Amino acid sequence: MKDPYDVVKRHYVTEKAKMLEGLSLGDGEGKKKGSFCKDPKYIFIVAGDATKPMIAEAIEAIYSAKGVKVKKVNTMCVKPQPTRIFRGRRKGRTAGFKKAIVTFVDGHSIG
């Protein structure tokens, strides 16, 4: 097996990712427990050649101190997006990447 930190690069933090984490745990006002998803979901940036079993093993190895168990892994590749810099003169592309939505067993979290 590869080093877990070569498979999972970093935790992906966006508004949508935080919503997936927060709504599943039912914390905060105005949020109903289980209104969006039953189990906690976290999003990670992973290596392009990583498979779902590799990602699950790496997450469990990285967070072994917290004793998390992975229930399900969904992956998707985000395509590079065109960009323009300085009034459209310099054109380029953002980097594409692969992300994984990891669902933990109910009652487990990394937060």
Swiss-Prot record:
A Pfam family that the UniProt record links to this protein: Ribosomal_L23
KW Zinc (keyword) present: no
Protein family per UniProt: Belongs to the universal ribosomal protein uL23 family.
SUPFAM superfamilies listed in its UniProt record: Ribosomal proteins S24e, L23 and L15e
GO-annotated molecular function: rRNA binding; structural constituent of ribosome
Organism domain of life: Bacteria
Subunit and partners: Part of the 50S ribosomal subunit. Contacts protein L29, and trigger factor when it is bound to the ribosome.
Keywords: Ribonucleoprotein, Ribosomal protein, RNA-binding, rRNA-binding
BP-aspect Gene Ontology terms: translation
Name of the protein: Large ribosomal subunit protein uL23
Gene Ontology CC annotations of this record: ribonucleoprotein complex; ribosome
InterPro entries, A to Z: Nucleotide-bd_a/b_plait_sf (IPR012677), Ribosomal_uL23-like (IPR013025), Ribosomal_uL23/eL15/eS24_sf (IPR012678)
Primary role: One of the early assembly proteins it binds 23S rRNA. One of the proteins that surrounds the polypeptide exit tunnel on the outside of the ribosome. Forms the main docking site for trigger factor binding to the ribosome.
Species name: Chlamydia trachomatis serovar D (strain ATCC VR-885 / DSM 19411 / UW-3/Cx)
